[in-house]
């Protein structure tokens, strides 16, 4: 009986909250409609023109990004190409990979998805064997590593899968949240609420730039099978 009463009470509380939310949405819509009704023709025309300008600007920005190679996950052939790619785009994610490292292939799949969703960010990959100078300069020692660059400068790193839950089964949303935490893409969710089911399991300690040290030219693998 007590359990049934608790469920009934919870249902009533939930119903009340839904009604309150619906009421607030309706009030907001009514307010917006009232504002439109009170506008004269000139004001409506200015509002229409303002929105058209915003749409044109957004379309121009999209075309500019696409012309610079955004919207797809691309491999660059050498470290020389890296500098030009980074120079022309505000936000860049570069995956430093190695063919023999299994976890790099896992990242490839998620990055390909995000590249199409986030046109504001350029997504690249570079084989570490073809970029020894760059890897030393950026302190790339663990494979895979994502270098996150803003305005041509390295802002953060995602080293291995530590920040992604130390599991091969992390979701694309988890990687998206991690990149959003570094302001390298436009994240629409709440950064204070990571898409983890178990926060204690996954943790929240990110790999910071200042912790990187050069220990030689051998690359460590984050994959168990490598």
Curated annotation (Swiss-Prot):
Phosphoserine: residues carrying this PTM: 188, 221, 223
User: Which molecular function GO terms apply here?
Assistant: cadherin binding
UniProt cross-references to InterPro entries, sorted A to Z? Thioredoxin-like_sf, Thioredoxin_domain
Q: Which residues form a coiled coil?
A: none
Q: Enumerate the CDD domains for this protein.
A: Phd_like_TxnDC9 (cd02989)
List where in the cell it is found.
Answer: Cytoplasm; Nucleus; Cytoplasm, Cytoskeleton, Microtubule organizing center, Centrosome; Midbody
What domain of life is recorded for the organism? Eukaryota
A biological process from GO? microtubule cytoskeleton organization
CC annotations in GO: centrosome; cytoplasm; cytosol; midbody; nucleus
- Say yes or no: keyword rRNA processing present: no
Q: Where is the Thioredoxin domain?
A: 74-180
Asked if the Swiss-Prot or TrEMBL record annotates the protein with the keyword NAD, the reply is no
Q: Which UniProt keywords apply?
A: Cytoplasm, Cytoskeleton, Nucleus, Phosphoprotein
Subunit-level organization: Forms ternary complexes with the chaperonin TCP1 complex, spanning the cylindrical chaperonin cavity and contacting at least 2 subunits.
Function, in words: Significantly diminishes the chaperonin TCP1 complex ATPase activity, thus negatively impacts protein folding, including that of actin or tubulin.
The protein here is known as: Thioredoxin domain-containing protein 9
Task: State the organism named in the record.
Answer: Homo sapiens (Human)
Which gene holds the coding sequence for this protein?
Answer: TXNDC9
